[in-house]
Amino acid sequence: MNTHPQTSPNTHYKIADISLADWGRKEIDIAEHEMPGLMSIRRKYASKQPLKGVRVTGSLHMTIQTAVLIETLKDIGADVRWASCNIFSTQDHAAAAIATSGTPVFAWKGETLEEYWDCTLQALTFTLADGTLTGPELIVDDGGDATLLIHKGYELENGSTWVDEPSDSLEEQVIKRLLKRIAIERPGYWTRVVNDWKGVSEETTTGVHRLYQIAATGRLLVPAINVNDSVTKSKFDNLYGCRESLADGLKRAMDVMLAGKLAVVCGYGDVGKGSAHSLRAYGARVIVTEIDPICALQAAMEGFEVTTVEDTLGQADIYVTTTGNKDVIRIEHMTAMKDQVIVCNIGHFDNEIQVDALNALTGVQKINIKPQVDKFILPNGNTLFLLAEGRLVNLGCATGHPSFVMSNSFANQTLAQIDLWQNKDVYEKNVYRLPKKLDEEVARLHLEKIGVKLTTLTANQAAYLGISVEGPFKPEHYRY
């Protein structure tokens, strides 16, 4: 962990090491060739400048692939500030390259929780020409932390007592202290932010779940676009991305032979499907746990054994959580696992595993092996290895998803930002999805790169199906 991040005099950036910029730029150049969707959007919209002068905050993993997204947003006119959405996911050379290009970025690998939330605040803080502090007009969010901070800050300024309520979560305690500090240092700040804020596009399942929860209570402050449920995001990033990056994270962290191991994948949504198939492809024997009978049946029909976590204790070598839920692996599970077990998470937040309870366990001994790999010697003498402190193993212990699949996701994010701005006076304060026509267009932008040739419908065929020759080709309710 870099405990002394480098800061520019004008708060232009706060990163690990600006000297890494040249390395970062070389990798960004490589990634651009693997991200045809984003590069096509640049070519299409650079002259039109649909986001000209629009203040955009990003709270999303500061990786090489994200750097290509940031520069795409800038190329189409946006005024961008950025922070990572995970304390371990930043690639420091990517952050350095972006800082050198003039984009304010506040991110480094190995932030503390206090540093993480302060970086989020920095990314949300724009200064107007008259010196007034304000916020973004649009947000690119991943997990909903930037959205959460604004909502909680605004609610505090309007009488909420949430910051004074007790909390068992260490991260919640950090957020509450930050909001109390801002209330003193910047009175009325969040109200000014909300007055200018026009929309948010959300990247991941967990963040989308948060948005729907807020919207259901009538507290959503702006229109939101659910990018996660675009087919070209969830069925590609979540599935095919995890299929490659989970094993990458496990192997970089532990140099473990997966073949012959018994692995438990908790959850069989798109992320769980990709994870289970990844482990099986390496020769692991895979057990799936599920709460949903449909997903459980899917797993069984794919040949996976489906049972409970409790039934696997003392047998499994590897546990992977993928659910987006909390307390999936609890302290009573971990103390009953076999010796030398590996536990990790590829869902967005660290609360899938009871990490705080593990750290607080009486008699436990914690030994850091290397960054993002911790060895716990339990009171019963068994050893448990926890990866990335229960946060995203593919980004904490490796470099996340490959560029090509992230081009799908980030093309959706860019189109969502354009759509939110163009329709800022049309959309109500609700959660929307991008139209299927755009979803198909994102897919189309990636076909040439991998040598795909589409069949074209004849007019008679299109009429028979009741669709246009150009699409959309499937109804909204179609399940891919």
UniProtKB/Swiss-Prot annotation:
Main location as per UniProt: cytoplasm
Needed co-factor(s): NAD(+)
One Gene Ontology term, aspect cellular component: cytosol
Keywords of the record: Cytoplasm, Hydrolase, NAD, One-carbon metabolism
Molecular function (Gene Ontology), one example: adenosylhomocysteinase activity
Pfam short name (any one): AdoHcyase
Protein EC: 3.13.2.1
PROSITE patterns: ADOHCYASE_1, ADOHCYASE_2
GO biological process annotation, one example: L-homocysteine biosynthetic process
Presence of keyword Hydrolase: yes
CDD domains: SAHH
Catalytic activity from the UniProt record: S-adenosyl-L-homocysteine + H2O = L-homocysteine + adenosine
Residues where substrate binds: 63, 142, 203, 233, 237
Pathway in which this enzyme or protein is active: Amino-acid biosynthesis; L-homocysteine biosynthesis; L-homocysteine from S-adenosyl-L-homocysteine: step 1/1
Annotated cofactor note: Binds 1 NAD(+) per subunit.
Subcellular localization, as worded in the UniProt entry: Cytoplasm
Gene3D superfamilies: Adenosylhomocysteinase-like, NAD(P)-binding Rossmann-like Domain
List of residues binding NAD(+): 204-206, 238, 267-272, 290, 325, 346-348, 394
Job description of the protein: May play a key role in the regulation of the intracellular concentration of adenosylhomocysteine.
Homology family: Belongs to the adenosylhomocysteinase family.
HAMAP family referenced in this protein's UniProt entry, alphabetically: AdoHcyase
Name of the protein in its database record: Adenosylhomocysteinase
Protein source organism: Xylella fastidiosa (strain Temecula1 / ATCC 700964)
